[in-house]
């Protein structure tokens, strides 16, 4: 299982949210490039970045910092937040983004998902962000009537291979992930599932790994010191090689 440390960007800084609430954002680092470098030094093989300003506005807002991170760390980066059309996807892939995450656009525009998957295949991931099992969009401000499992199945049928699942009520809480919803999703589709939201310690990571989940995104638990990234990667890799 791959561990993806998270960088959430707001106005050029690293922040953490609580249950997706933009008003409750807290700056955890002034220099995201420094954070990314530290993640790399601690053994990260992949970094998860969200442009929170982009998620709200529908346009990438932190591109210069994201580009600097890519050039500086030289390990794969996946990016979500504000990606709404194929031109933006083209631009991001050209800029060196390894995997582009579609959320709002995927729910509102199935045609875009089809086009993007046809052109970029595994480089496209879908963010399935759920609130009470319904898919939330537009920076998690609006909750649709679409069930998260139904949405994931539809994305799989289009050809999507990677799904990032977040239970919004758990995000930033350090109360543990929603294992029931995660299990249901993993049993319902054959896509690679990356778990996000609420992971609080190494035990959570071990449980997720035992569920045969492809990856786990860890944010607040690293910034708060609950998880030592280097130690977590070593432990999870050791368990993988048994």
Swiss-Prot record:
It catalyses: 1-(5-phospho-beta-D-ribosyl)-5-[(5-phospho-beta-D-ribosylamino)methylideneamino]imidazole-4-carboxamide = 5-[(5-phospho-1-deoxy-D-ribulos-1-ylimino)methylamino]-1-(5-phospho-beta-D-ribosyl)imidazole-4-carboxamide. It is an enzyme of class 5 (isomerase). Keywords: Amino-acid biosynthesis, Cytoplasm, Histidine biosynthesis, Isomerase. One of its GO terms (molecular function) is 1-(5-phosphoribosyl)-5-[(5-phosphoribosylamino)methylideneamino]imidazole-4-carboxamide isomerase activity. InterPro entries: Aldolase_TIM (IPR013785), His_biosynth (IPR006062), HisA_bact_arch (IPR006063), Isoase_HisA-like (IPR044524), Isoase_HisA-like_bact (IPR023016), RibuloseP-bd_barrel (IPR011060). Transmembrane segments: none annotated. GO terms for biological process: L-histidine biosynthetic process; L-tryptophan biosynthetic process. CDD domains: HisA (cd04732). It is found in: Cytoplasm. Pathway: Amino-acid biosynthesis; L-histidine biosynthesis; L-histidine from 5-phospho-alpha-D-ribose 1-diphosphate: step 4/9. This is 1-(5-phosphoribosyl)-5-[(5-phosphoribosylamino)methylideneamino] imidazole-4-carboxamide isomerase.
